[in-house]
Amino acid sequence: MLRRKDAGNVPNTVDAAQEKHVPVIEVKENLVTVKVGSVTHPMLDEHYIEWISLETKEGNQRKELKPGADPVAVFALAPSDDVVAAYAYCNLHGLWKAEK
């Protein structure tokens, strides 16, 4: 039996507000900013983004988040690297993905 939290292991498949969960990727030179949602996701003790991950052609980077923090992460890219996708994990609604 899956717990609600585990139901979101396939990205973007949980019935929840996409505008608050799908990562938004912004690339400026070698810095990548990933914001969770086009509408800011709540960061409450009972409902928050646990982590944000950036997948690149050369690997992955991840930032752990806590309740009360901004649901944003900034990652640095090597000159030869490119963004593939960003992921965010909501403690209630599971895994969300955006491709670049």
Language model feature labels by segment:
Residues 82-92:
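Short, aromatic- and glycine-rich surface loops/edge beta-strands on solvent-exposed regions
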Residues 58-68:
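Solvent-exposed serine/threonine-rich low-complexity stretches and specific carbohydrate-binding patches
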